[in-house]
Amino acid sequence: MNTTVSGLLLCLATFIGVHLSANPADAEELVRFESAPVKLSPFRIRKALEQGEILSQPQGTPLLGYLSRPAGDGPFPAVVILHGCDHLRLSVKELWPKRLVRWGYVVLVVDSFTTRKLADTCRSALPERVFDAYGALDFLSKSGFVDIRRVALMGFAAGDTAALDATKTDGNEQLMERKFRAAVAYYPACDADRGDPTVPTLIMTGERDNWSRAERCQKRLARLSDNAPPVELNVYKGIYHNFDAPEFMVGRRVLGHIEKYDADAAAKSMRSVYAFLRKYLAN
């Protein structure tokens, strides 16, 4: 290859590299924020006053997050993502954010474990994650490029269980200044007694998922009131846990549960998410 051609290719590579790295749509930014503080209820405050106590407002927990955004000034709709009990796997931290950014959404993936020095919570629960979600929402409200009226909460497994808890009637949502517009739940642990959601909700799970059983989600839907926001439940026949995650192309058994990717179910679920967000995060 002659010197002129080599020089041109080098310049072209440099140009492409610079412009791709400068494009916000291709950049992932590490950000820091705090979970929403556990707000004291009016009842708790009143009881403390009756007993002569002075209560201090609890502080939020420092958290890390990964922020991705489309090119342009916005304001854009946004999606807050809560990872599962196994922390930040590839599909949650990279594949879904890139997909959502292509669709026109700002994405904030919340890391609930690193600052708490946790490896996983697959044998336990972390109820504080509801407050992590609202801390992320507060963070986005200060960005200037997010339309805070159009933010959805999306979670996977344990993260989705937290998402459903964060958007339920009589839950902590009523104490929060800012609200989510919609919720997307991949294979959550549904609770038939959780009550009505406060926002339109999309739930997707596999028929053979014995970790997040579809029957429990079906029971919850059967108990919703007539005035509940719309809830869509998609149960994919013959499908296991983590069906949307290509890192589980070869199935594996974890704590007695099968995790296995399925390309067809994954594609169907992505189309459902796309249509759901387009509908409920529209202007």
Where are each of the predicted segments found?
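C-terminal catalytic histidine-bearing segment of alpha/beta-hydrolase fold enzymes
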Residues: 230-283
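Alpha/beta-hydrolase fold nucleophile elbow
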Residues: 146-157
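Short beta-strand/loop motif that positions the catalytic acidic residue
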Residues: 203-205
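Short alpha-helix in the alpha/beta-hydrolase fold that links the catalytic acid
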Residues: 199, 213-223
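Short substrate-entry loop that stabilizes the transition state in hydrolases
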Residues: 74-76, 81-119, 210-214
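Alpha/beta-hydrolase active-site loop
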Residues: 123-144, 165
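N-terminal cap/lid segment of alpha/beta-hydrolase-fold proteins
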Residues: 25-73
